């Protein structure tokens, strides 16, 4: 639908339909009100463009319909900026935010100033709890993650609710500003929110990047097949 990033939607589609032969339904967010969602075990919200209609006023999505779907046992998976949509419409989430102010930056340099705070694509190391269902099948205690967003969720106070955390000195490749790196180090890329009989599963990093970042594909599959025990 309008505002959904086609790259992200296509990456998810390719992974499930082409690589794993799992049939999916591609639904326009504006058409959900006309669809019986009880047919589906999971709904996946890909990333969206900030400032799009998808971000505002529920983005044309019938929010009550989604709430009822989850409470009755459905599962919602939200990626990257869609995590913000969940926070605005379904369940409040705490975020760390970059509050940097321009100091000695003139008007002609403003685009470079803001551009330096964007994380266009970088690789970060994470430490995982292999006993948690989100990490089933991963043999190492560490998992490199591909990140191209500036969404930083706060960690849970209960350590067992943080099955994926960034390691110390997490930057492995790419660029991130010092300000955002400090936020990343105290954030978690994954959360589970329980609501009624269902769950909301949140992921701020891209587990399916361009059909070659295979190491984290298992994260999405575990959200699909093991959400009932998370």
Residue ranges and their predicted role:
Residues 44, 75-77, 95-97, 217-229:
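C-terminal, active-site-flanking charged/polar segments
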Residues 13, 29-34, 64-66, 112-113, ...:
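Generic recognition of flexible, low-complexity loop/linker segments
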Residues 18, 22, 133, 139, ...:
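Extracellular ligand-binding/catalytic regions of CAZymes and related secreted enzymes
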Residues 24-26, 76, 123, 163, ...:
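Conserved beta-strand scaffold positions in the cores of enzyme catalytic domains, especially
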Residues 91-93, 97-98, 155, 192-195:
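Extended, composition-driven regions rather than compact fold-specific motifs
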Residues 127-164:
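Metal-dependent peptidase/peptidase-like ectodomains
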Residues 2-94, 210:
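Helical hinge/lid and interdomain linker segments adjacent to catalytic or ligand-binding clefts
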Residues 55-140:
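A glycine-rich, often tryptophan-bearing local segment used as a flexible ligand/cofactor-contacting loop or short
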